[in-house]
């Protein structure tokens, strides 16, 4: 390399290859690196490591606390759900009871009404039967009388008893 | 500028050596492009490989820097 | 040299990386306080502000600055745990130191007019070399000669194994190189491009708004790259550590 001969402060060639400055650069570089190394390893790195560890610890603790709170929240939710279900069941029960009561009342009323209806029906039936009876009697009377008259008109002497028996036989037959 | 053949040779040589920088650029582009192609196919694996990417780029680039250095030496140091 | 630029455009994209003494302009000895020293000091201050002052509240519910510090802690912690497993957590302070230093040095370097310590190969080589030595020593201490099984791919056919062993060995020793150049190269390239665009803006007069838009876009990209490079450096450290703890394929 030709630079070894040039040297000096003249801007000839690459300053990087100015070998006369190498010992100087190396000397100061080593000092600077040692300084940085000691600053880092004695002060900065233990401090940062401690801070990071502390933060890690805090985060872990916070996470645990959060987990606990979450569990609590889940428990509370469960209790709430249970209460809700209970209330719902109770409401159902009340509804069912009310329904049963109403049903029972309704049944009683219906029965009463049925009985009344049945009594009325029986009464009417009796009345109808009486009417029918009397109607049948009247028909018998009319038939007897008619039969007597007919016999008389035809010239016979009607025996009341025979006529009645004949009419009765006819009415039955 | 009168007929200094040696100086002309220096300059021509420096210019030729500078071509090497372009070649290194091709190399670096190749590395990065292939990395991107692979990363798009499998994005989940890409994050773990960026260190490899940079090492590859560094190796490709170092040789280009050597060419640049030769150019500098020819220009300034010979 | 490109510095003898033509056509009126004077761009010195590499000037921002020059190491110079803070006081006077004598020779740079190994103990001379330089702009590297200043910005490394700022990185230490930034780490202190973020991780010590920001977390002083020790609150369970973190303040804004405390949660940023905790996020960074948790991010790297998870990364180490995912990649290396439980055994790797012993080395978490070491990896966290690397991550925070790279991330904050990258971001500090994005302040206009600042000096970016991570753009220097000397710096990143120390970081990557330290990782390499640590991982190799750790591998042999933990596994003894069994660590060499890392290179003996037992799943490959027997004929191929010696060839694979050579390839694995080479790739093992290339690790610190790519590990360091990747970080320095990314940061350096971004800053140099910003400077080139700034040079355009200075020379275009009325039309300078076009490169200024470009600067805004590239600046945004650089913010992203700063974070990604810190992440990549850290995760590769984790991967190498995993190889040392569990060398069997």
UniProtKB/Swiss-Prot annotation, chain B:
Gene3D superfamilies: F1F0 ATP synthase subunit C. F-type ATPases have 2 components, F(1) - the catalytic core - and F(0) - the membrane proton channel. F(1) has five subunits: alpha(3), beta(3), gamma(1), delta(1), epsilon(1). F(0) has four main subunits: a(1), b(1), b'(1) and c(10-14). The alpha and beta chains form an alternating ring which encloses part of the gamma chain. F(1) is attached to F(0) by a central stalk formed by the gamma and epsilon chains, while a peripheral stalk is formed by the delta, b and b' chains. The keyword Iron does not apply. Keywords: ATP synthesis, Cell inner membrane, Cell membrane, CF(0), Hydrogen ion transport, Ion transport, Lipid-binding, Membrane, Transmembrane, Transmembrane helix, Transport. It comes from Jannaschia sp. (strain CCS1). GO terms for cellular component: plasma membrane; proton-transporting ATP synthase complex; proton-transporting two-sector ATPase complex, proton-transporting domain. The keyword Transmembrane helix applies. It is a multi-pass membrane protein. It comes from the Bacteria. GO terms for molecular function: lipid binding; proton-transporting ATP synthase activity, rotational mechanism. The chain crosses the membrane at residues 11-31, 53-73. F(1)F(0) ATP synthase produces ATP from ADP in the presence of a proton or sodium gradient. F-type ATPases consist of two structural domains, F(1) containing the extramembraneous catalytic core and F(0) containing the membrane proton channel, linked together by a central stalk and a peripheral stalk. During catalysis, ATP synthesis in the catalytic domain of F(1) is coupled via a rotary mechanism of the central stalk subunits to proton translocation. Key component of the F(0) channel; it plays a direct role in translocation across the membrane. A homomeric c-ring of between 10-14 subunits forms the central stalk rotor element with the F(1) delta and epsilon subunits. Coiled coil: none annotated. It is found in: Cell inner membrane. The record marks 61 as: Reversibly protonated during proton transport. It holds the Pfam family ATP-synt_C. The gene is atpE. This is ATP synthase subunit c. Belongs to the ATPase C chain family.
